[in-house]
């Protein structure tokens, strides 16, 4: 039997939404192991002078709890 845990993680990028999600995985994996999935709750953009300046994502990261 496996037990999974879900945490909320916010990410951002100046490139794209995809890059923002990749940043979430990269940063979360520094403290969380066994990431199994990332669910994107919301996507936002920051705009200045009618141009997108930053892509933001609100995600739920699911990972398996292991006992070592």
Specify the residue positions occupied by each region the protein language model found.
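Short, conserved loop-to-beta-strand elements that form functional interface hotspots
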Residues: 38-47
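C-terminal structural segments of small proteins and small subunits
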Residues: 50-68
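Generic "edge-of-domain/loop-turn" microfeature
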Residues: 14-16, 45, 62, 66-68
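Compositionally biased, disordered extreme N-termini, encompassing classical targeting presequences
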Residues: 1-2, 68
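Noncatalytic linker/hinge segments flanking ATPase motor cores
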Residues: 24-25, 47-52
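A structural signal for short, well-ordered beta-strand segments
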Residues: 9-11, 43, 57-63
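Short, well-ordered alpha-helical segments
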Residues: 2-36
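Structural motif
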Residues: 4, 38, 56-58
């Amino acid at each position: 039997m496996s037990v999974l845990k879900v945490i909320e993680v916010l990410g951002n990028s100046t490139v794209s939404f995809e890059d923002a999600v990749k940043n979430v995985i990269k940063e979360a994996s520094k403290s969380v192991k066994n990431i199994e999935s990332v669910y994107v709750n919301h996507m936002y953009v920051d705009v200045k002078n009618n141009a997108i300046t930053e892509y933001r994502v609100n995600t739920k990261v699911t990972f398996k709890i292991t006992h070592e």
